[in-house]
């Protein structure tokens, strides 16, 4: 598995055997010789593996910028450290095996820079994003794509001028010259001369003169650097002197006993034992971690803790100055000459200049701000996406904008995005209406690619506004074309060859570059209590064993944000449908990808198969299969309360045959189909990053969702209290394990900011309603007399009638829709397709006591289509007690609006799915507590019955009409002259669901703007 503290792209060590072969030349790497690796994503499990190379072959594939990029560099012998440094400084040229000579005499070719004549006009300059014409000179900086490191160095091409202007940024060092570029020798003579002028080497004399200008400061710095270098050399020789003697004079058992005698944990592997022992003998025995009492271990730039702060999370403590005690050699080792003569001398370990100082991660009692308490130990943690709103997006700029190209590029990159020059690669285009009218060739490419165009003030708004990305895109869209913008997920590692089969064992496959992160669709065959995993190849001839009411099937999860892992493990005991044959099938990998593998073990008696199943389960979880109380252990999997879609087939049959015998009016039939549309539910879950393979619709338990709410409450409180990053990390790991997410190859993001936590709260709100809808669908499947649509209609326990659009009440509602469409919601218009009158069973009786309150209004409430089965069957609900309070502007209540488009925005429709549902409810507001800014209401002031958030615009009160004693504020929007409010439009909140009586349900079509004129 990937090391929890080491996420570096490269690794160096001495070969432990002579079995490994070089990935470049395919020859074996001799034992004890220096070998270098590029770390790549394993296709077999959720972690990284080294691709080893001979030292000389390595530099033909890697572009190392600094020794600190290499894990294990400081553990090398001094001479080998110098060798690596020299290779880095010379651009990877080693002069050894595989080395290449440059064009100029005595100069070596730089392996990570190249020059050539462009072979076509398809390449794009990485500096200016413009095309490089065929036969034009282009210069490349070779880099490793972090998502596909196994591909080695990849050319990133530049125009000559663009490369020259970025010389320092591209680390083309002053001492490098054009003559050292790979391919320089084959250029035409005149081009060679021109390139030499533009990319000259800076002479060393010039450097010395510059140093003299700085005077004593540079001399002093140089002296300090030389002293540090000598100290590092002496330190390396001391450590390796100890290592060599330990290997020569001590057995492995002797070394283990020495570690135990000095209260140190004994690691696995001879090299690890020697490393730890030499460190302790040189600098002193390490005291336990001050945070978790775990074992500290030296790794390249600091001492890292290998312990755990909880059963869910590894400790992230690291330091360069650990507490130590004197090394003690037990008397029984006095017969070993080396140990008898060894005299311990206390000293501190010296670190290279480029090693960042390691600050210890604050413990749970720290008062450090949560925003800044992330230690360097966890610098690679992925922050919540809300921090950089354009993360994963490529933008194209067309025409003259308010910012020049360089400023725009920096601005976009600061927001997490990238600028591209190719329309087909862009998610969004920044331009102006003038450019659209002009319709240049570039804008034609944008239109043909279907890329939405937004005005350039979109960038300013997204930086300063707290609004959602999609909402801002809709607000600033200026093109008559363009689909809903999707954020691009980083590509996974390139696919490797696989011999996957349904036999004894299969290898995994890494996703294709453009494959995104969606799990493959599987047809699940349900037999008895659970579905047989189709990857077993036995779905047609076997079933999952069920004994004493227990189904022998388990899905396990393990998330570690520090490691970047998001793993699953599936286990099933299968019994032949006819014969007495048994199999234990297991599969594993990374959630949301095809990374992983599987294994099928065959047994001829039940007891042997059960023993194997129980043994694997206990190995992976630390718990016995028969145990009733599960205990989570560090680095062990956690069982998820899910299954492979029990009742899925029955639900499909129910929905597919719907409508043939229905007694309902056609518009009501269509409404029921819409509310119970399983595909819409699945789309919603995918939108929430839920992994449908591990969390299918059929098994969204309320208990699981409520536990997830509680975790979000805890993490929200931790962020608010500026708790330690370790606590937030722990809660994040637990949340993602409980609710499996599909992040593809991205690291699971830390739940470290309020906006991202609120996104997850909204996700759980919607999952609760989806759970209700699916539970209703599964119930009452047996009735063959009634039409499935009628059965589902009855489950809602709501009387639904179609309202004639020519009726008085319908005309009032249509006027209400027309007049209260807010001016700022100008990216769509609304058409009312159907109006339904609704009457929820028992709701009027509940509402009757509040009917006596003054100020009853008919107000809007919008929600996703997938939520309406829950809303109609159970009513509008207040967020559960487990849910965090953050994100609710006026506390936990039921929210309404008097502007139709304010509520319509919560329908979450799109151009691809433009039909939504919106409610009109009679709300007993009584005496309102009026507010202009956020206030977390837990109890209303005495004499108040509701809260009104005052907006800057509202329906003209003079046009309010009454229908059966209920006010309908259907006037056109007007300025309220309230300027000191944080709300654009009014909000109404009640804190008792009994104050709501749902009256109408509207089916509305969103007409997204298709024309600018």
Swiss-Prot record:
Renumbered residue ranges of the record's region Zinc ribbon: 284-326
Catalysed reactions listed for this entry: NAD(+) + (ADP-D-ribosyl)n-acceptor = nicotinamide + (ADP-D-ribosyl)n+1-acceptor + H(+); L-seryl-[protein] + NAD(+) = O-(ADP-D-ribosyl)-L-seryl-[protein] + nicotinamide + H(+); L-aspartyl-[protein] + NAD(+) = 4-O-(ADP-D-ribosyl)-L-aspartyl-[protein] + nicotinamide; L-glutamyl-[protein] + NAD(+) = 5-O-(ADP-D-ribosyl)-L-glutamyl-[protein] + nicotinamide
A Pfam family this chain is assigned to: WGR
Gene Ontology CC entries for this record: chromatin; cytosol; nuclear replication fork; nucleolus; nucleus; site of DNA damage
Residues covered by the BRCT domain: 385-461
Top-level EC class as recorded in UniProt: transferase
GO biological processes: apoptotic process; DNA repair; double-strand break repair; innate immune response; negative regulation of innate immune response; negative regulation of transcription by RNA polymerase II; positive regulation of single strand break repair; protein auto-ADP-ribosylation
Binding sites annotated in the UniProt record for Zn(2+) 2: 125, 128, 159, 162
Entry remark concerning the domains of this protein: The two PARP-type zinc-fingers (also named Zn1 and Zn2) specifically recognize DNA strand breaks: PARP-type zinc-finger 1 binds PARP-type zinc-finger 2 from a separate parp1 molecule to form a dimeric module that specifically recognizes DNA strand breaks.
Assembly and binders: Homodimer; PARP-type zinc-fingers from separate parp1 molecules form a dimer module that specifically recognizes DNA strand breaks.
Protein's name according to its UniProt entry: Poly [ADP-ribose] polymerase 1
Species assigned in the record: Danio rerio (Zebrafish)
Upper taxonomic lineage: Eukaryota, Metazoa, Chordata, Craniata, Vertebrata
Gene it is expressed from: parp1
